[in-house]
Amino acid sequence: MPKDKKEAIYTIPLSRVYWGRRTNRAARAIKLVRKFIARHFGVKEEDVIIHNNVNEYIWSRSIEKPPRRVTVKAVKDPETGKVKVMLIRESKIQQGQATS
């Protein structure tokens, strides 16, 4: 697969962050998004810029319960070589209610 893409839409599965301990799942989800985009665009992880909307969406249910997947749009700037990651679709996440 060529790594000279300019723009792409991805649904990134974040279920892998649930394997570890609960206390830093959202932070690991951000790192996973960065690593995923870097791998698919052929750039370093330092060259991936995550938009604030993506960060807020992942942290929306606190540090322990990030969403299972996130759909993002990644755009590569040909001049700087940096990739910007933006949220494309935000599904409604609601806190679960206790059932009796």
Curated annotation (Swiss-Prot):
One Gene Ontology molecular-function label: structural constituent of ribosome
A single GO BP: cytoplasmic translation
Entry keyword set: Ribonucleoprotein, Ribosomal protein
Any single GO CC term annotated in Swiss-Prot or TrEMBL for this entry: cytosolic large ribosomal subunit
Pfam families membership: Ribosomal_L31e
Family per similarity comment: Belongs to the eukaryotic ribosomal protein eL31 family.
UniProt cross-references to NCBIfam families, sorted A to Z: PRK01192.1-1
Full protein name: Large ribosomal subunit protein eL31
